[in-house]
Structure formats: C-alpha cells, structure tokens
Amino acid sequence: MDGIHMIHGYRWYDPSRKWIGVLQIVHGMLEYIERYDEFAEKMAEAGYYVIGHDHLGHGDSVNGAEELGKLGEEGAVLWLKDMELVRRMASAAAPKVPYIMLGHSMGSYLVRRYLIYHGERVDGAILMGTGQQRLPLVKLGLLTAYAGMFRDGRNGHSRILDLMSVSGFAKRYPDNARTGSWMSRNPQVLLDALQDSKRNFHFS
C-alpha cells in the first residue's frame, strides 16, 4: 500500500466445501508466505480458507532482490495496513465464519500490534514464537535503531541490532552457529534456508 510495490499474496482453499473459518497467516522476519505451503494445504483440507501475503521488503513484494529487507519510510505501519487489507479481502470471500489471525516470530509481534488497534475485527489469534523483553532493553534497542538511522539512513544495516536480536540466538549453538541452528532441529530446513535467496538478506 505504498503506491510503489505490488503486494504478493496467496490463498489456499477447497472451493467444493463449506469453509469452517478463515486463517490469515502473518509470516516472520526473513521469510515469505509460500514457506507455509504445506501447513496451509493441511488447513485448507481441514476446511479453512487460508490467506497470507509477503510483507513489504520480503518475498515477491519487492521490485528487485536489492529491495529485500528494505522497509521504506513508513516501515511497519504499512505492514499493518497490508494485513488489514488482506483481512478485508478474506472476509469478503468467506463471510460469516470465524476469523483467526496467526503470526509467527516477527509476525506474532505484528499480530499483537494489530490486535491493539483492531482486535474486534477478528475472532481469535495464534501467536507462535513470540516473546517479551524488559523495558530497559527495549529502550536500548530503540536508541540503537535511531542512532543507526541517523548515521546510515533508514535503509542502513546495524550489526549491533543483529547481535541484539536474531544473530544473538546463535550463541546457544556455538558448534553450528553459522547454519542458523536456532531456527529448527530439522537439518533439511536449515539447509533450505541457507540456499534460499529470499531468506538471506539484511534488515534495514
């Protein structure tokens, strides 16, 4: 909804049956909606109308690989607007059934933010891989982010923020840290992530 990019979305559903609900998937950082294909197919088989989209700066919602990880001037504000647009589309396609919003990792934080403003528009929410930090750490992260933007601009990259967030998880797996072992216990999932160009980029 920034007037520049076409937001890529995907739907999974069985048109021959009566849907028992809508499931909107909100993906996490450094991934894209079609990674959820196997799960979404299962949910569609169970009777759900499943929908999701690639956030701005992710997957196919970019105009080129160089835009991966770039959030633009409004950043997460646009992500929330896109989530609401997708919700409206799904509600129109499958009205009068329970509406559930599922967020994974970064997506869980977006869903939490969405619920603050529009919680009455959904019937339920599933938060996977979410978390909470102490207020002093949150303030430190914000200060670091603002300092980085002042120095490098909004599309800059902060190694310090990486270490404070995602890259810091690797410390728990020192023998295999570079493979992103913290993401999954399944070796094939880790290998797929390393070989996927849509998952190997730096966040602005």
Q: Residue locations for each model-derived region?
A:
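A short loop-to-beta-strand scaffold at the N-terminal edge of the catalytic core in hydrolase folds
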Residues: G3-D14
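Alpha/beta-hydrolase fold nucleophile elbow
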Residues: A94-S105
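Alpha/beta-hydrolase-fold enzymes
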Residues: V111-K198
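Active-site glycine-rich loops that stabilize anionic/oxyanionic intermediates
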Residues: L23, H27-E31, S105
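The serine-hydrolase catalytic nucleophile loop
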Residues: M29-A40
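Glycine-rich nucleophile elbow surrounding the catalytic serine of serine-hydrolase chemistry
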Residues: G103-R113
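Alpha/beta-hydrolase active-site loop
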Residues: L71-S91
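Conserved alpha/beta-hydrolase
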Residues: A40-E66
